[in-house]
Amino acid sequence: ERKGALQLNGLLDMQKPHITYSIFKELARPTLFIANSDLEAKKVYNELRFYTKDKVEYLGTDEIYFYHLDAKDRSEEAKKLRVLLKLAKKQKTIVVTSVDAILRKYIPKKVLLDNIFTYKIGDIINLEELSQNLVRLGYERVSRIEGLGQFSIRGGIIDVYSLEYTNP
């Protein structure tokens, strides 16, 4: 398997999702589809979901919703983080994006991967250090978790609602 980019031009719009999925099936790494616009990217994404719902992701540009300015809804941020993690970990997935979205600044791959920490049963955890690390990464310490990006430490029990997962 050769590494590098594959660029296809001259395809009809209706051929793009089918050809992309055909290429994706043959590769053991992520496939990145860059569309001319967010509108085209969303259309290709929706069509690719016909072929594979669980292996296709959409990475769009940041949209500003003025009625959400004060809300602490981090679901869009979480979706982007999950997509970036899949790319960084080289998971087999199709990421559909636009030129505008791909030109945005994202967290460097090394920084992203260096800030992932995993614990298993039996590990001894320094709660103060864990708390500081989570706050440094943008998590909010709360008494009761209600949303993404929050964590709670009560009586030696740690609850984290990671942006990487859909459930706490």
Walk through the language-model features, giving the residues of each.
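ASCE RecA-like P-loop NTPase motor cores
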Residues: 1-168
